[in-house]
């Protein structure tokens, strides 16, 4: 491609495909902009920053990934035909995929606003755009003036036919039994997200090590691009620590805070920590050094948080004891109630320590499938898992809305359960699982997995196997590390890793890992996976005590299902002109009917009675005429030789004029009229052609039993030309004369 704008371009081969990174062609007024391309898929990633005019205690990073419909040659389906409104679920998930590995790499204390936008501007529908957006966003930040520790490379690693493949096409990835998205820096992995079909833990560990080696060329590209076109970084100096405040606060708080951190109940511990802070603050305000400058105490919260982190970590490393008194491998007590809700199709309460979820399953028809507008066209989704995290679950007051975190946790639980679902052919219901977090003290997404599995089984969904999930943590200091099983919320915040693993007794179905430290040795990864398997098997055993297998029958409140097979040729008849027939069936019965081109019809109804009625009405259109059976037929056509009548939908028969009445009929219309209903008997079926008799029905009414021989079509008598006799001469008719009997000689008429 000709370089018209003086752009800087780099290429590299990664996973057998050429990756292009370019800057200087588009969005030159952004602080950093990168065009990243693989095949026909292009993502434009931009970074902008500006200082805030007010002081805040957090890093205001915003990441938005957007799929432009023009990228795939499509027009948005919205009313305004624009990409407006809230982002799609995929856009939200990819935005999180970019945010999670990048956010920890900005310097602590940096509070400038930073906005990262990743726009898909071309999509070939073969090369996925999510990992390109991650790589391009990292490269754009590297080029910008925003301080950033190191580049991050993203890639998809799949196992296809037993072999690892890096960044496969969308078609290839659909065949994989392991599909992971990884993000890594030069030294280690920093994020993992993916799903699997019962893959052993050892295979996942191998895939992650292999992926880290394979993504190094992408890191090289970003560093080279930075050398070619990078801007000078903002000179950021972290705020100076108030050492006097720190020393005095720690001296006042250490003993009381250590005691508060041994309170096992979450809310009581929260109150105890709050009391410690208030006590320390009151004591410091009595100190002349702070009494005159109370604004110095603004940093007290951060100082106590750092002290809390140090106390908790040291206790775990030295004593092997955690905040709630457990050792490093023990899973919190589990309590399960199946069938908790009387009217739900399936429900379960899953409680693990102070984390509790109410999970509900609802069955629907195929018309309830989620339909989405995407770059690949209109797609449908038959299984949905929605995770809700209301503010009361943590005793807080907040606006109620669906957050990105809730969407992400729901997607993780959905991936965990999807591999065990029955196929649409064997179980054509649409499935919606909702996890309502009732209480939360860590691992609520894994409670959604466990409760979701139980809820599906309670609903009678024939899952292949139960699924359980566990969240693993890590405490690492120098060369010493400890892996934690079933982490609390505080341990998640104070630890170095959040590694969620879900699966069956056979293998893993979903993983999600976020790492807060620079490197994760293979030994740590292996131990985390092994401990997670032990915990998962323990949880599955507890679940089996309550509900060892799916219910044998669906709830009486669930939709009733009947599947019938009909001749594909009569589908149009069942539907009717403009959908007239199918609408009449659904209106009369309240059923939902899904018709496939193969002739397979799924009938969903609220009750068995309405299902039976709908089935009967559908099968009415698939009837076949039976010899000797009487039918009420409608006259469709009057002919000289008889009448054409409709005896069944899409089936017509001929009533010969001789079969219209017991007496001789001169004209068909003397007996029947167009549109008239008449009682007839089928007297002949031959090669798809049907003959009927009104006469036979009339004779039966007179007590004369119908004899097929009486109404069968008489065989035609052979016509022998010799039987016609001699035509004889013309007799007294005279000569025919000339041409055409007009007399005279031909020449005479000239």
From Swiss-Prot:
Its EC number is 2.7.7.8. One of its GO terms (biological process) is mRNA catabolic process. Gene3D superfamilies: GHMP Kinase, N-terminal domain, K Homology domain, type 1, Nucleic acid-binding proteins. Its cofactor is Mg(2+). GO terms for molecular function: 3'-5'-RNA exonuclease activity; magnesium ion binding; polyribonucleotide nucleotidyltransferase activity; RNA binding. It is found in: Cytoplasm. Residues 559-618 form the KH domain. It comes from the Bacteria. It catalyses: RNA(n+1) + phosphate = RNA(n) + a ribonucleoside 5'-diphosphate. Mg(2+) binds at residues 492, 498. Residues 705-750 are annotated as: Disordered. Residues 628-695 form the S1 motif domain. Residues 717-750 have a biased composition (Basic and acidic residues). Involved in mRNA degradation. Catalyzes the phosphorolysis of single-stranded polyribonucleotides processively in the 3'- to 5'-direction. Belongs to the polyribonucleotide nucleotidyltransferase family. This is Polyribonucleotide nucleotidyltransferase. It comes from Oleidesulfovibrio alaskensis (strain ATCC BAA-1058 / DSM 17464 / G20).
């Amino acid at each position: 491609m000709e370089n018209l704008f003086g752009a800087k371009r780099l290429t590299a081969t990664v996973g057998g495909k050429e990756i292009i990174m370019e800057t200087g062609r588009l969005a030159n007024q952004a602080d950093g902009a990168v065009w990243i391309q693989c095949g026909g898929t292009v993502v434009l990633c931009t970074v902008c920053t500006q200082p805030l005019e007010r002081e805040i205690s957090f890093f205001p990073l915003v990441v938005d990934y957007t799929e432009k419909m023009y990228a795939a040659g499509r027009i948005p389906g919205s009313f305004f035909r624009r990409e407006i409104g809230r982002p799609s679920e995929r856009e939200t998930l990819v935005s999180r995929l970019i945010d999670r590995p990048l956010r920890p790499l900005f310097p602590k204390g940096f509070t400038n606003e930073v906005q990262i936008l990743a726009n898909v501007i071309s999509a070939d529908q073969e090369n996925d755009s999510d990992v390109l957006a991650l790589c391009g966003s990292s490269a754009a930040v590297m080029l910008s003036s925003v301080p950033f520790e190191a580049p991050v490379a993203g890639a998809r690693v799949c196992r296809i036919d037993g072999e690892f493949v890096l960044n496969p096409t969308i078609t290839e990835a659909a065949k994989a039994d392991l599909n992971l998205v990884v993000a890594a820096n030069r030294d280690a992995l920093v994020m993992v997200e993916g799903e699997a079909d019962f893959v052993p833990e050892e295979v996942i560990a191998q895939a992650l090590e292999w992926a880290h080696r394979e993504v190094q060329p992408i890191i090289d590209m970003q560093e080279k691009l930075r050398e070619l076109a990078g801007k000078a970084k903002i000179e950021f100096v972290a705020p100076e620590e108030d050492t006097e405040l720190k020393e005095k606060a720690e001296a006042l708080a250490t003993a009381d805070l250590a005691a508060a951190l041994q309170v096992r109940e979450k809310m009581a511990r929260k109150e105890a920590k709050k009391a410690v802070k208030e006590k320390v603050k009151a004591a410091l305000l009595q100190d002349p050094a702070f009494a005159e400058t109370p604004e110095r105490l603004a940093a007290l919260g951060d100082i106590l948080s750092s002290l809390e982190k140090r106390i908790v970590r040291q206790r775990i490393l030295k004593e092997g004891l955690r905040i709630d008194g457990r050792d490093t491998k023990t899973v919190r007590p589990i309590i399960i109630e199946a069938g908790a809700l009387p009217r739900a199709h399936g429900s379960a309460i899953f409680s693990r320590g102070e984390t509790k979820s109410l999970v509900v399953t609802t069955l629907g028809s195929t018309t309830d499938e989620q339909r989405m507008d995407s770059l690949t066209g209109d797609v449908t989704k038959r299984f949905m898992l929605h995770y809700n995290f209301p503010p009361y679950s943590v005793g807080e007051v907040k606006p109620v809305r669906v957050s990105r975190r809730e969407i992400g946790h729901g997607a993780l639980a959905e991936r965990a359960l999807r591999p065990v679902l029955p196929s649409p052919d064997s179980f054509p219901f649409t499935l919606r699982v909702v996890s309502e977090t009732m209480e939360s003290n860590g691992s609520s997404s894994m409670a959604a997995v466990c409760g979701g599995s139980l809820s599906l089984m309670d609903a009678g969904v024939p899952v292949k196997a139960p699924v359980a999930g566990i969240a693993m943590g890590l405490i690492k200091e120098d060369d010493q590390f400890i892996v934690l099983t079933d982490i609390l919320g505080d341990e998640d915040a104070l630890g170095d890793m959040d590694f969620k693993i879900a699966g069956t007794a056979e293998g893993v179905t979903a993983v999600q890992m976020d790492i807060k430290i620079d490197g994760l040795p293979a030994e740590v990864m292996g131990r985390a996976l092994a401990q997670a398997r032990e915990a998962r098997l323990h949880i599955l055993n507890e679940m089996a005590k309550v509900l060892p297998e799916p219910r044998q029958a669906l709830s009486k409140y669930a939709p009733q299902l009947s599947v019938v097979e009909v001749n594909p040729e009569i589908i149009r008849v069942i539907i009717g002109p403009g959908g007239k027939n199918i609408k009449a069936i659904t209106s009369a019965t309240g059923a939902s009917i899904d018709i496939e081109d193969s002739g397979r019809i799924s009938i969903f109804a609220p009750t068995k009675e309405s299902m039976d009625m709908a089935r009967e009405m559908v099968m009415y259109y698939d009837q076949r005429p039976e010899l000797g059976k009487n039918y009420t037929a409608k006259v469709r056509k009057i002919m000289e030789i008889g009448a054409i009548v409709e005896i069944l939908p899409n089936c017509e028969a001929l009533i010969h004029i001789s079969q219209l009445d017991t007496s001789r009929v001169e004209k068909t219309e003397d007996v029947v009229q167009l549109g008239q209903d008449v009682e007839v008997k089928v007297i002949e079926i031959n090669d798809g052609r049907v003959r009927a008799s009104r006469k036979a029905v009339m004779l039966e009414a007179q007590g004369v039993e119908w004899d097929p021989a009486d109404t069968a079509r008489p065989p035609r008598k052979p016509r022998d030309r010799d039987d016609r006799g001699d035509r004889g001469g013309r007799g007294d008719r005279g000569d025919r004369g000339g041409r055409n009997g007009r007399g005279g000689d031909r020449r005479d008429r000239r």
